[in-house]
Amino acid sequence: MDERPDPVTPPADLDVVPVDLRDYVDFSQDAAQRVRVFVTPTTALDLWCIEPRQATGVLSHPDADTTYTVLGGRSWFVTEEGEVGLDPMGALLVRRGVHHGIDNRGTDPLIVLASMSPPDDLAAGTPVGDSSAAVRPDDGGPGPVSRAMGRLLGGRRGTA
């Protein structure tokens, strides 16, 4: 498997910095994965890659508003006020200081794009696992990245 590219720290002299989010998809059967795509002094962009029956655990960003956009799969965002289910292309704003979590109760892998301002201290490009996330047993089928990419981009399902 190819290595993920290093996260992008945009040079100050560039006004536009393109990235291919597919290069940052990183699932784990052990825990939900958060991958930092890029960071500036004012904004961070992360991908959450969450297998079925996994969750992020409790998240809270005391100094940052965070927007979440579901790219693939079906998500449940859980807060103290209740739950919100989002399908692909659904988005949610979570204000600073609100405790929340992302739960994948579906049968498909879940990919969520998170934009945070100002950014937290996550080391760039380091997936972060949550030990409280559920573990998905290995069923011997196609790998999670193959399944997610096939569902997101079309093509033959179940191929590696």
Segment roles from a protein language model:
Residues 108-125:
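A short hydrophobic beta-strand segment most commonly corresponding to one strand
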Residues 57-58, 77-78, 94, 100-106:
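Short beta-strand His + acidic residue motifs that chelate non-heme Fe in jelly-roll/DSBH
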